[in-house]
């Protein structure tokens, strides 16, 4: 977190605290005034307190956005011994470059998805096993 974001957090907290205290004072004075005066002419929060609250919220949002640190991207294959920790992200891989080797050697990079047991034709496998079993029984006789 940078110095600017810490400063903005502090200023926004002070401004919001002051606007909250001013609002409390206003409502307390309004309550005392309504006990003494039955008409109670002022019931709305003054605009300066509202503007102070909005300014504090805007400063807080700016502090949040300035507190983000620059992301550090790390390559997948690195020999410098860096360990990926929180806040560090791997660089994106261009899929067309990643699959060139797989295409040249004829392997399927999605093999673990395509060749799962749930996609195997069980009836065909049983038929092949029956034919193999019947052929081995015939050879033994």
UniProtKB/Swiss-Prot annotation:
What residue intervals traverse the membrane?
A: 7-27, 49-69
Sorted keywords for this record are: Endoplasmic reticulum, Membrane, Transmembrane, Transmembrane helix
Membrane topology type, per the record? Answer: Multi-pass membrane protein
Q: Which cysteines are joined by disulfide bonds?
A: none
InterPro entries according to UniProt:
EMC_subunit, MMgT
Subcellular location(s) of the protein: Endoplasmic reticulum membrane
- Mapped to this chain, the residue ranges on the Cytoplasmic side of the membrane are 1-6, 70-141
Q: Name one GO cellular component term.
A: endoplasmic reticulum
Does the UniProt entry include the keyword Endoplasmic reticulum?
yes
UniProt xrefs under Pfam families: MMgT
Biological process annotations from GO: phospholipid metabolic process; phospholipid transport; protein folding in endoplasmic reticulum; protein insertion into ER membrane by stop-transfer membrane-anchor sequence
Q: Which residues lie on this side of the membrane: Lumenal?
A: 28-48
The record's subunit annotation is: Component of the ER membrane protein complex (EMC), which is composed of EMC1, EMC2, EMC3, EMC4, EMC5 and EMC6.
The record's similarity note reads: Belongs to the membrane magnesium transporter (TC 1.A.67) family.
More about this protein: Present with 5240 molecules/cell in log phase SD medium.
- Describe the function of this protein: Part of the endoplasmic reticulum membrane protein complex (EMC) that enables the energy-independent insertion into endoplasmic reticulum membranes of newly synthesized membrane proteins. Preferentially accommodates proteins with transmembrane domains that are weakly hydrophobic or contain destabilizing features such as charged and aromatic residues. Involved in the cotranslational insertion of multi-pass membrane proteins in which stop-transfer membrane-anchor sequences become ER membrane spanning helices.
How is this protein named in the record? ER membrane protein complex subunit 5
